[in-house]
């Protein structure tokens, strides 16, 4: 599933032939690691495809995301309405931006040429359990696409009772 795309400008000083960056999620690779609502952990394989005159490759990565539905947007709205019947939209936005309830770790698996030949296998470097902020659209959308593939609903639609 195409999760993100960015087309490079042809008139750019760095890139003169266009191209772009495309991020794909292998929805068949999504695995449930933990199911203990409101806590969830999923892992999946995703690909970052770079196409330009200076970089043409496919990077394969494994992503593990920990979800805490106590911080889903629907839960934040519900709890905000319970505490204050007319919450300020600004307070709600600040709360949603400060904690998304998502944490990730990623591992580089392999790098391929555009025709699928193995280019190199990077040393396995894991990132620590880093927060995914809603402003980080690429990683947030990737985490949400994983949740959608596993549970057929968006993470931010989950309401914790």
Description of each model-found segment:
Residues 1-62, 67-161:
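N-terminal secretory-pathway/extracellular module detecting exported/lumenal segments
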């Amino acid at each position: 599933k195409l999760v993100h795309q960015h087309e490079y400008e042809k008139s750019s000083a760095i890139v003169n032939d266009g191209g772009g960056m495309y991020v794909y999620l292998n929805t068949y690779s999504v695995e449930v690691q933990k199911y203990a609502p409101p806590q969830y952990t999923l892992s999946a394989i995703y690909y970052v495809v770079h196409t330009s005159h200076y970089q043409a490759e496919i990077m394969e990565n494994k992503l593990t995301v920990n979800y805490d539905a106590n911080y889903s947007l629907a839960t934040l709205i519900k709890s905000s309405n319970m505490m204050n019947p007319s919450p300020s939209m600004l307070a709600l936005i600040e709360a949603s931006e400060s904690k998304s309830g998502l944490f990730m770790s990623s591992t580089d698996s392999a790098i391929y040429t555009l025709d699928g030949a193995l280019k190199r296998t990077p040393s396995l470097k894991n990132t620590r359990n880093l927060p995914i902020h809603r402003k980080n659209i690429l990683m947030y959308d990737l985490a949400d696409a994983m949740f959608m593939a596993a549970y057929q609903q968006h993470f931010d639609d989950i309401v914790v009772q």
